[in-house]
């Protein structure tokens, strides 16, 4: 097995990687829709990764591998609970997720002051290790009423509907058409034609 991926990293002013977006992945012949990056001038670092099947079995040791494994789940190249996610929490930095992108917690106060002085809107959506899925991947034939309630690393099959109070964690999701009004916890999957009622939680 051969896995090749191209990612775009976002960093703090001190050079710390905050997150990595992988729009291009070739998973042993299965590919994402994007085949190459547009020829834009950018100050962001472009990351190229080449993995084998053994890398899926290794614990996570850095931000780059953490984000690649989360992308593999949400692109549905791998099933939940099929790859090693040990070390995920320790590898992911806690990040301020805003309408202007990922910002380091150490720098958010400065950014807030800057936004007020320059009359630029800075909307803080969450402070978390995991970003919303839809900041990175738009799954096909899926409805999500509140995108903040589905994390990157969620596995959503076509025909899935997630209502306003539904929640899907990373390494969790649906294996077919489903109506999700409750919570799907990490490590849990629901089968085809499932209906998870409001207020319910699967663990």
Label each PLM-derived region with a short phrase.
Residues 1-135:
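Terminal amphipathic alpha-helical/low-complexity segments used for targeting or macromolecular assembly
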Residues 118-158:
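Right-handed parallel beta-helix
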Residues 142, 148-150, 154-156, 160-162, ...:
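A structural motif detector for beta-strand N-caps
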Residues 50, 54, 128, 132-134, ...:
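Generic preference for well-ordered secondary structure
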Residues 43-47, 122-123, 139-142, 174, ...:
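Short amphipathic alpha-helical segments, especially helix-boundary/capping motifs
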């Amino acid at each position: 097995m051969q896995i090749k991926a191209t990612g775009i990293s976002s960093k703090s002013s001190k050079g710390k990687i905050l997150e990595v977006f992988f729009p291009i992945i070739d998973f042993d012949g299965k590919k994402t829709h994007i085949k190459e990056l547009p020829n834009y001038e950018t100050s962001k670092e472009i990351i190229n990764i080449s993995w084998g099947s053994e890398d899926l079995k290794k614990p996570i040791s850095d931000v780059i591998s953490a984000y690649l494994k989360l992308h593999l789940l949400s692109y549905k190249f791998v099933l939940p609970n099929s790859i090693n996610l040990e070390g995920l929490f320790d590898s992911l930095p806690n990040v301020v997720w805003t309408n202007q992108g990922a910002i380091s917690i150490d720098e958010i106060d400065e950014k807030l002051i800057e936004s007020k002085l320059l009359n630029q809107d800075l909307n803080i959506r969450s402070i978390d290790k995991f970003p919303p899925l839809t900041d990175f991947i738009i799954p096909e034939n899926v409805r999500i009423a509140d995108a903040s309630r589905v994390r990157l690393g969620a596995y959503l099959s076509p025909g899935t509907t997630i209502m306003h109070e539904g929640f899907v964690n990373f390494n969790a999701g649906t294996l077919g058409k489903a109506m999700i009004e409750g919570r799907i916890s990490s490590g849990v999957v629901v089968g085809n034609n499932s209906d998870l009622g409001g207020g319910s939680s699967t663990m």
